[in-house]
Design a protein with these regions (language model features):
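Short glycine-centered, acidic/aromatic-flanked micro-motifs in structured strand/loop junctions
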Residues: 26, 84-86, 183
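Short strand->helix junction
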Residues: 31, 89-90
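Conserved AdoMet/S-adenosylmethionine-binding subsite of the radical SAM
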Residues: 92-207
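Auxiliary Fe-S-binding modules of radical SAM enzymes
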Residues: 1-17, 63, 70, 193-207
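Conserved alpha-helical substructure of the radical SAM core
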Residues: 45-81, 98
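Short helix-terminating capping/connector loops at secondary-structure junctions
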Residues: 33, 74-78, 110-113
Length: 207
């Protein structure tokens, strides 16, 4: 079953990686909007979940986040992390940089020990305002499933036909180590296509 997350705030949930995670979803609450259309996405395919609602505004995100943090404080539940995730690519929001600033300010006010994490697919690493915002967060978690462009087009299915993996790699390097690279290794078939990326052909260049 696919998952469409509430917006702009969901959880908290218990993450094996991150601990008690309060989710921040910058996509519409009724669908998926993403610069990738990955075959393994838990939110399903883009075409099957077209949103009709707009993205939440910067103000709506700030107000909802503060209300939830107050609720968690009053209940004695401290988040380990505030995580940007949800129904698509968070850095595609037109006010992503400002929302990051708001989130850090609210984190510092209510739960200064909590981390701020961003889970993203690396599509917009070339945008200066996105890059600068990600340098401010604690966990800048970027996806790169492989360096093989044919595999990326088959499995990650970027919406932009001009997607260039060399540009993405250059973008990852531009963070000078302030980055966590995550990948999806898998075996299997998608229809008639082999989607195994665990062989040396894929792993050696990735390393």
């Amino acid at each position: 079953a696919t998952i469409i997350y509430p917006s702009p705030i969901f959880g908290p949930i218990h993450s094996r990686r991150l601990g008690i995670s309060l989710g921040i979803n910058l996509q519409p609450a009724d669908g998926k909007s993403c610069s990738f259309d990955c075959i393994y996405c838990e939110c399903g395919y883009n075409a099957d979940h077209r949103p009709t609602l707009p993205r939440p505004t910067r103000e709506a995100v700030r107000e909802a986040l503060e209300a939830k943090l107050i609720e968690m404080r009053d209940s004695g539940t401290a988040p380990d992390v505030l995580t940007f995730a949800g129904n698509g690519e968070p850095t595609g929001h037109p006010h992503f940089a400002e929302i990051i600033d708001d989130t850090i300010a609210l984190r510092d006010k209510y739960f200064p020990a909590a981390k701020v994490s961003v889970l993203r697919n690396s599509t917009f690493v070339h945008r200066p305002q996105v890059h600068d915002a990600l340098m401010k967060v604690d966990n800048n978690i970027l996806k790169l499933d492989t360096v093989d462009i044919d595999y990326i087009r088959k499995v990650d299915r970027p919406v932009n036909p001009h997607y260039n993996v060399d540009d993405i790699i250059a973008g990852l390097r531009s963070f000078n180590g302030h980055v966590i690279v995550q990948t999806m290794f898998m075996k299997g078939r998608m229809g008639t296509d082999d989607v195994d990326n665990t062989s040396d052909r894929f792993v050696a260049p990735w390393l």
